[in-house]
């Protein structure tokens, strides 16, 4: 089963216009929704007993997806002290070494925090250091307030080497 070339081209065009990110059709895959992709990626990436890094609070499908893959979630807290953003310095080195992937959801629902270029650069460096895949849930990039701007993880140098990004048509375009 292949995606329609017109759909892939439209996604590439949208990413260029909206996020100023150049991607090619071979870097795009459609799912029946970003929830499906995030919920099933653990079955592809994980073996029984692997560790995955999940935010808390988080969308329940993040947990279910990791468990479907046989992985053990390790929860990193999103605290007020750090602006409800991932703070990789609090992830113990022994945990980071075992992790297959880390899910990052920015802009974050329900807290509304938005990632900065500096944070994304830290995540890229963390992923490279520990050979971890960053799974960026970008479903809410167009639903933010107070003048904030949602962005793509792929705007960060090196992010395409260590990341997968999920974008949702249902949130931005009410397409389900």
Regions found by a protein language model. Give the residues of each.
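Active-site PLP attachment segment
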Residues: 149, 156-176
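A short helix->loop->beta-strand "cap" motif at the edges of active sites that frequently abuts
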Residues: 50, 71, 126-133, 160-161
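Active-site phosphate-binding strand-loop segment of PLP-dependent enzymes
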Residues: 79-147, 151-154
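Conserved coil-to-alpha-helix start sites within the AMP-binding
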Residues: 34-38, 58-62, 173
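N-terminal small-domain helix-loop-helix segment of the aminotransferase-like
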Residues: 1-35, 40, 90
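Short acidic capping loops at alpha-helix termini that bridge into adjacent secondary structure
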Residues: 22-28, 48-51, 98, 160-163
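Conserved PLP-anchoring active-site segment centered on the Schiff-base-forming lysine
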Residues: 44-66
């Amino acid at each position: 089963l292949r995606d329609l070339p017109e759909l892939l081209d439209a996604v590439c065009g949208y990413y260029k216009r909206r996020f100023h990110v150049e991607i090619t059709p071979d870097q795009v895959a459609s799912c029946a929704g970003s929830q499906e992709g995030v919920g099933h990626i653990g079955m592809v990436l994980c073996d029984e007993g692997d560790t995955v890094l999940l935010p808390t609070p988080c969308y329940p499908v993040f947990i279910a997806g990791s468990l479907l893959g046989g992985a053990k979630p390790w929860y990193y807290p999103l605290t007020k002290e750090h602006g409800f953003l991932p703070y990789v310095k609090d992830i113990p080195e022994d945990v980071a070494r075992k992790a297959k992937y880390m899910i990052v959801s920015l802009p974050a629902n329900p807290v509304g925090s938005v990632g900065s270029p500096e944070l994304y650069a830290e995540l890229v460096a963390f992923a490279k250091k520990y050979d971890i895949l960053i799974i960026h849930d970008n479903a809410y990039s167009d639903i933010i307030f107070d003048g904030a701007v949602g962005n793509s993880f792929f705007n960060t140098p090196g992010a395409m080497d260590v990341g997968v990004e999920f974008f949702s048509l249902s949130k931005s375009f009410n397409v389900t």
